Amino acid sequence: MGGKEMRNCKELKHEKNGNVTEKVGKNKGKSKKVSKDESLLSFDLFLEGKEHSAYKFMGAHFITENRKRGVRFTTWAPRASKIYVIGDFNNWELKEEYSMKKINERGIWSLFLPKLEEGIKYKFAVVNECGNNTVYKADPYAFKSELRPNTASVLTKIKSFRWGDKRWLNKREKEGLDNKPMNIYELHLGSWKRKDGEFMTYEEISEVLVEYIKEMGYTHVEFMPINEHPLDASWGYQGVGYYSVTSRYGDLNGLKTLINKLHKNNIGVLLDWVPSHFCKDEHGLFMFDGSPTYEYEAWWKANNEGWGTCNFDLGRPEVKSFLFSNAMYWINEFHVDGLRVDAVSNMLYLDYGREYGEWEPNIYGGNGNLEAIAFLKELNTIIKKEGKGAITVAEESTSWEGITKPVEEDGLGFDYKWNMGWMNDTLSYIELDPIYRKYHHNKMNFSMMYNYSEKFILPISHDEVVHGKKSLINKMWGDDWKKYAGLRVYASFMMGHPGKKLMFMGCEFGQFVEWREWEELQWNVIEEFDIHRKTKEYFKALNKFYLENSSLWSLDYEEEGFKWIDADNSEESVLSFIRIGKNKKEKLIFICNFTPEVYYDFKVGVPELGEYVEAFNSDALEFGGAGNIVGDSILKATEESFKDFDYSISVKVPPLGTLVLKVK
């Protein structure tokens, strides 16, 4: 099952059966004599797995050496016997004068070439340890790559950029988000909007996205991966160029323009990031030097059969330096405010996606990947120390303990974790006919049993509206009116539930078709159909309501910020609860009715004697509802007790609707 160690000169090649085959050949990997300039470079931290800015010296950099302007190429390929730099400048031929020098025994190769200009395409021709096979690889540290289907790296400088977001960054560093509003709009840049059916540039996107986010009232955007990737249908999650801003939408400064404009308009930017696995395309990281390099040496551990990818070797120092540096690259160079770390479960578990007999336990006999655990702890420690307020979010789908617990307390150290349990439970509930919902009431209240075990974000992400899962609006039960009413009550229940929020693009105006990465959202329906326009207005109003009421976010992760009124009314499929703000006077009462019945004189407990008024109602006519609203009426609490409350009121509750009340 496991791979064998490499000794002397052996070509290591993965086989489908999980073993490793060896072919002994002549060792051609001896170090050459290096110049004084080369010897001045220190790779100690990189080789120890402690380098956080490897992109500043690995890859291709325009420099002056011995009074000559040119490019220094540097790469890591420990088992290569020879490496050539090939490209436009030498007709892609393997010539000795373009042969890189091995400058240490750990596999650092380097070469200075004069008179090269920006825009030149290049690759590394890597000869394996035996000298009998050559692979043509893109530069793992390249800042730019060709647009697919072409695969070469492109010589690019990190040009100066005039940032205007200092005020935003200072605020980010000083203030955390736990007690602040966080309402995230997740989007895929290639399909949010298009121009004449083609990709828009980062600059063009900035002209429309910023105004839309401001109009709708979201606090953050989350971009699906924007590093270079060969396959559009992978959405960026199967990457090759970890340091290359995808050429689909432009260049590095184009992306900086987009982020800068978002920040100047007080909109945060999160980025999906994938340190778990990478694609197996021939020009990429896979078998980089003809043998396992960035991936695990043991094939069972390296091969991710479910996704057709390879898992990073998270225990290898040079791979750790590659990934730590990449995380800081996005934070330092592009000012992103946080990384949403993809597929954390795949990293944590040795048996993730594997059957019995397909994996080996760790040294303690368990299924935890000890190297990945250590990697994630170190990653989060680095970002906390050097990221100046940048956050990390874990996409983790199991009950692994301590995801958001501090590293000092033996947690993994993430700031937030997606609440996949809440998402799965509630989405399965809303698809049910209301007749049967009372038998599944626990799907809507169970999340509060573990809500304070982690710092959760409630996600309705891209994964839930593709591959036959149906769009969010189409998951709802009933005819069109009931579907839109169901969407409104569900969204307002989500907004009232403790935890930060995330909603995928298109859900906010009720797009019926599933998300398609090859075309833009169906924006035309907003103009053509009144219900889509009203649904958009509903989400706009709901987002504004969220922002304006600190009780909905100031105590998300404190138990005193939430109190059930009635968690167990399964017979009527109603959930009622109170959200409480920091000063304890800020209180909102939520009554969420998941049936199509109007409940007249519905009794609900209230925290104090006094007068109550309507703060929000999902059934308002302007949102496409039936108009079952309290309006300007005043509801007077009585001393009639209800559940754990000494006082109560009676009110009309709208069908498939949420009524929110507050003290006058």
Swiss-Prot record:
- The active site consists of D342 (nucleophile), E395 (proton donor)
Checking InterPro entries in the record gives:
A-amylase/branching_C (IPR006048), Branching_enzy (IPR037439), GlgB (IPR006407), GlgB_N_E_set_prok (IPR044143), Glyco_hydro_13_cat_dom (IPR006047), Glyco_hydro_13_N (IPR004193), Glyco_hydro_b (IPR013780), Glycoside_hydrolase_SF (IPR017853)
GO annotations of cellular component type: cytosol
- Transferase as UniProt keyword: yes
Q: What is its EC number?
A: 2.4.1.18
Q: Where is the composition biased (Basic and acidic residues)?
A: 1-17
Q: In which pathway does it act?
A: Glycan biosynthesis; glycogen biosynthesis
The UniProt keyword set, sorted, is: Carbohydrate metabolism, Glycogen biosynthesis, Glycogen metabolism, Glycosyltransferase, Transferase
Q: Which reaction does it catalyse?
A: Transfers a segment of a (1->4)-alpha-D-glucan chain to a primary hydroxy group in a similar glucan chain
A GO MF annotation of the entry reads: hydrolase activity, hydrolyzing O-glycosyl compounds
Top-level lineage group: Bacteria
Q: List the disulfide bonds.
A: none
Q: Where is this region: Disordered?
A: 1-31
- Signal peptide residues on this chain, from the entry's feature table: none
Checking CDD domains in the record gives: AmyAc_Glg_BE (cd11322), E_set_GBE_prok_N (cd02855)
Any one biological process term the GO annotation gives: glycogen biosynthetic process
Q: Does the keyword Cell cycle apply?
A: no
Listed under subunit, the entry gives: Monomer.
Q: Which family does it belong to?
A: Belongs to the glycosyl hydrolase 13 family. GlgB subfamily.
The task this protein performs is described as: Catalyzes the formation of the alpha-1,6-glucosidic linkages in glycogen by scission of a 1,4-alpha-linked oligosaccharide from growing alpha-1,4-glucan chains and the subsequent attachment of the oligosaccharide to the alpha-1,6 position.
Q: Which PANTHER family match?
A: 1,4-ALPHA-GLUCAN-BRANCHING ENZYME
What is the recorded name of this protein?
1,4-alpha-glucan branching enzyme GlgB 2
